[in-house]
């Protein structure tokens, strides 16, 4: 009846993994030599997927040669498969970075925010679109930079920040 993009299910999908990962990369192992010794160590990386084949979690070594330290990236998606939230956790430094993404009714990115540890949430970018769905302006940071986009009558990108040149 309705395309999946118009189904704006308000709640994110659960982080349920799947065992049906045929033709998907689920892990890797690589070896590297340490500079100060003749010993060779190896590191493993793992990727977990949901039932739609989207990566819900990635685990990889925090640094080369660091034993037990991992970077864990966890993704949460909407019903239509758009990335809603990404949480990045870095090893033993206990650094957590949370990125959130907001979309309009057509599935276009309208806002991206980021939060580090106990800091307040900051706006990374805000996008506005014209009536044809083309990117009209992009506000980066909390008003640090505003990029404006202009298009030709055919819909081709004519200029970015054209006012600065004139």
Predicted feature locations:
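Beta-strand elements of repeat-based all-beta scaffolds
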Residues: 1-166
């Amino acid at each position: 009846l309705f395309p999946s993009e118009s189904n704006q299910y308000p709640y994110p999908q659960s982080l349920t993994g799947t065992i049906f990962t045929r033709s998907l990369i689920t892990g890797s192992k690589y070896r590297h030599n340490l500079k100060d010794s003749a010993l060779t160590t190896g590191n493993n990386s793992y990727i977990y997927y949901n039932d739609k084949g989207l990566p819900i979690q990635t685990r990889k070594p925090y640094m080369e040669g660091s034993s037990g330290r991992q970077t864990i990236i966890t993704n949460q998606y909407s019903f239509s498969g758009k990335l809603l939230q990404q949480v990045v956790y870095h090893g033993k430094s206990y650094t957590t970075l949370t990125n959130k993404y907001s979309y309009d009714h057509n599935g276009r990115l309208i806002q991206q925010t980021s939060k580090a540890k106990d800091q307040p949430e900051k706006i990374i970018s805000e996008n506005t679109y014209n009536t044809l769905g083309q990117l009209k302006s992009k506000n980066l940071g909390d008003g640090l930079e505003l990029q404006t986009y202009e298009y030709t009558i055919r819909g081709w990108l004519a200029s970015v920040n054209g006012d600065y040149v004139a």
